[in-house]
């Protein structure tokens, strides 16, 4: 049991205090086998029509600025077959726009929220100064992107 549980890829995810930026946050989730694990959950994965889910997501204290350190080798130095640690059931439906028209699209498991679902996840708080997002073109005007 211990080898099966601990002999997995590891991701250490830097988390910054949530100051309203869009992005995924650290949450405990329960998979289809009823097992709890730490995951990075994106807003598109949350049923915002469900008042309690929306409240939990909206009140999250931290989010992931995509600062990750990963270990992809086993304790004996062999590379993991990373496809063995994907949760292929973690796809979700999201709204996108194509040529100014709203459409719904199925997203397959993303890197944080499916492809790394069965990794060992460790979340650590990092200073906000390490986060300089580019989610929109206006973010390029922020202090962290100005060199003059």
PLM feature segments, named:
Residues 1-148:
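OB-fold and OB-like single-stranded nucleic-acid-recognition modules
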């Amino acid at each position: 049991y211990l080898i099966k549980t601990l002999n997995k890829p590891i991701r250490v995810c830097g988390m910054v205090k949530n100051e309203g930026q869009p992005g995924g946050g650290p949450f405990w989730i329960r998979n289809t086998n009823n097992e709890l694990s730490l995951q990075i959950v994106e807003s598109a994965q949350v049923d915002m029509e469900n008042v309690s889910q929306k409240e939990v997501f909206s009140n999250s204290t931290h989010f992931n600025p995509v600062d990750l350190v990963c270990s992809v080798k086993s304790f004996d130095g062999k590379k993991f077959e990373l496809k063995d640690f994907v949760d292929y059931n973690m796809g979700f439906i999201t709204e996108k726009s194509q040529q100014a028209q709203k459409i719904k699209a199925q997203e397959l498991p993303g890197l944080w929220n499916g492809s790394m679902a069965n990794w060992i996840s460790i979340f650590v708080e990092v200073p906000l100064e390490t986060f300089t997002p580019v989610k929109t073109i206006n973010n390029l005007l922020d202090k962290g992107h100005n060199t003059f």
